[in-house]
Amino acid sequence: MGNFQLEDFVAGWIGGAASVIVGHPLDTVKARLQAGSGYGSTLSCIRTVYRRESVFGFFKGMSFPLASIAVYNSVVFGVFSNTQRFLSHHRCQEPEAGPPHVLSDLLLASMVAGVVSVGLGAPVDLIEIRLQMQTQPFQEANLGLKPRVAALGEQPAYQGPVHCFATIVRTEGLAGLYRGASAMLLRDVPGYCLYFIPYVFLSDWITPEACAGPSPCAVWLAGGMAGAISWGTATPMDVVKSRLQADGVYVNKYRGVLDCMSQSYQKEGLKVFFRGITVNAVRGFPMSAAMFLGYELSLQAIRGDHVVTSP
C-alpha cells in the first residue's frame, strides 16, 4: 500500500465541485432532451425551460449533485490514479522505472474506475434525473396516460433531494435507487476509458518535451477534448440510462435496458439514441476542463509542486 496517495481523492473532490457548477445547466437541458417530450431541438428546450421556469430552471436539482458528485469524482479520480500507479509499479517492480503512462495500465485503471463509479454514482444520478424531469412537459399521446394521471405531471412529484430519496425508497425499495445501473455500467466502463486515456495522451502530446509537466492551459484543453470525446461517444447508452432513471416519476414504461432500447427504437427510430449528442459534447468540454484543471491545480497545491502532474 506504499503507492496509495490520499491527495488524489482530495483533489478529485475539488475538481468535481468545479465541474458540477460549470456543467449543471447543460446537464439539465440534456436530461430534458433525452427523457422528456415536447422539445424540438436543443435551442427549443433551452427557450422552453427559460420561459416556464426562468434561469433557475437550469439549476434545478443542483444542490444534491453539488454535495454528492464532488465525493463521487473524488472516488473516481482517487481510484483511477491509485490503480494506475499500482499497476505501473507492479509491472516495473521499481517505483521510478519504466514509462509513466502505458496504455494497458490506463485501460485497466479506467475500467476499475468505471465499475466503482456505478456503485457510488447510480443513486446520485437517479435522484438528479428525477428532480430535473419532474416539471418537464409530458405529452398524453406519447405516454398513453389517462387525463387524470397526465394532469399530475403539471405538479412537482418531489420537494427536494431528501424527499426524492425517501419517496423512491418507499415506493420502489432500495433496489429502486439503482434503476438504470446496468445501462450506466455499459456507459461508464467504456466512457471512462475514453475519458482518462485521451486526456493523458493529449496532455503529454501538447506539452513540450522540455517541460516537466503540462501547463494549466494544456490541462484545460486536453481535459475539455477528452470530455467531449467521452460524452459524445457515450450518448446512445446515456439516452437509455436517462430514460430508465426518469421512468417512474409518473409512470413506468420500461422493463429493462433491452426493453427501453426496443421501445425507443420502434417509436422514434435510430436517431433517438443520438438525442442530446450536441449538448453532451458541448457540455463535456467545459465540465471536464474544469474537472481536470481543478484536480491538477489542487494536486499541485497539496503536493507543493511547481508543475502540474498528470494522473
From Swiss-Prot:
GO terms for molecular function: transmembrane transporter activity. This is Solute carrier family 25 member 48. It is a multi-pass membrane protein. The keyword Cell division does not apply. Keywords: Membrane, Mitochondrion, Mitochondrion inner membrane, Repeat, Transmembrane, Transmembrane helix, Transport. It comes from Bos taurus (Bovine). It is found in: Mitochondrion inner membrane. The lineage of its organism: Eukaryota, Metazoa, Chordata, Craniata, Vertebrata. GO terms for cellular component: mitochondrial inner membrane; mitochondrion. Solcar repeats lie at residues 3-86, 100-205, 214-301. Belongs to the mitochondrial carrier (TC 2.A.29) family. Its main location: mitochondrion. Pfam families: Mito_carr. The chain crosses the membrane at residues 9-29, 61-81, 107-127, 193-213, 217-237, 277-295.
